[in-house]
Design a protein with these regions (language model features):
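ATP-binding glycine-rich loop module of kinase domains
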Residues: 2-47
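Active-site beta-strand termini and strand-to-loop segments that position acidic
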Residues: 10-14, 76, 114
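Conserved structural core of kinase catalytic domains
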Residues: 22, 36-91
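Protein kinase-like catalytic core scaffold
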Residues: 16, 72, 120-122
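Short, exposed beta-strand/loop patches in secreted or surface proteins that constitute
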Residues: 7-10, 62-65, 111
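N-terminal non-globular leader segments, chiefly Sec-dependent signal peptides
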Residues: 30-41, 57-61, 139-151
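Short, surface-exposed beta-strand-loop junctions and turns on beta-sheet-rich folds
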Residues: 24-27, 80, 127-129
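C-lobe/activation-segment region of protein kinase-like
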Residues: 84-108, 112-151
Length: 151
């Protein structure tokens, strides 16, 4: 499976895939994204907070580990049933609040229904960071002074 910023490579283990990030050859542009180590860090953080103890019963984030310059390992998920964010808006609002407390602005992610009924949140390449003045800055440098959450 290939996207604009990288591709997913199946491994011999059916529960593990490799997320390979396209190498950046030009300066940051509107489509620039975080590199593999930062994507893995964001995904690992999100995986650690999307727990039953934190109030999540449907939303979860697949594990990510072993970041390298242009790739990292990730738990396999099914991507054949996209989910509209409105279907799990309560848990997404909780996720946004926890992310904001860490200085993270979630955006441009994807949601997929899993065979067990849970919803996997993936795609951390365009997450922005909150700045002290209440604006957010994206990986390609754009700053929004009044960011709006989709919920």
């Amino acid at each position: 499976m290939q996207g604009a910023c990288g591709k997913i490579i199946l491994t011999a283990d059916p529960g593990i895939v490799i997320k390979k990030i396209h190498r950046r050859r030009r300066p940051h542009t509107r489509t620039s994204s975080h590199r593999a180590p930062e994507q893995c860090r964001l995904q690992s953080w999100a995986h650690s907070i999307c727990t039953k103890e934190n109030g999540f019963s449907t939303l979860y984030v697949p594990r990510a580990w072993d970041p390298q310059a242009h790739q990292y390992n990730m738990e396999f998920i099914h991507t054949d049933k996209p989910v509209d964010h409105k279907e799990i808006s309560v848990e997404l609002q909780l996720f946004y609040n926890l992310a904001k407390a860490e200085g993270i602005f979630p955006c441009d992610y994807e949601l997929y229904r899993q065979p067990n009924g849970s919803v996997a949140l993936i795609d951390f390449d365009k997450f922005a960071i909150w700045r002290e003045d209440g604006s957010v800055q994206f990986p390609w440098g754009l700053v929004l002074s009044d960011p709006q959450l989709p919920i």
